[in-house]
């Protein structure tokens, strides 16, 4: 087991990933889906507040950064003229389902059910960007998904209380970010595979 303070590595990793994503927004190569980024900033912050109240500490650093980074990107999407993705009905529908799951998460007094609804809320928030990454990989930048993943991996090595509410969100974010990165790099990955065959 690693020392708990190593979770602090997620702060510089998250900041670098965010800065590189914003740089790509200025270049026009990253256009965030505002529904995803708004809900990605909201759900982790609520989760941090709840888990902090239940005694979690160091394991919350990467989760906090999972909310802080999208919040910064969301703010910049209103500043940078070309820095956002045009929303469609599907995006709003996913947003509504995510908000419903967030509300259920907040009103349910059973920690494991609340945790499930938190993941469902984040999943619905992620779907529009996952679809966008796979259909339009040129509209996404992988840094904001790759670098924070390292912080979540470290987080799994510092957890002392192996309750699902402690480690589940980090595992979920690793899976979701991997799907996003594969979508963004799909043409490069598949092209290399086909040349090797």
Please annotate each region the language model reported.
Residues 1-197:
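Alpha-helical membrane-protein topology signature
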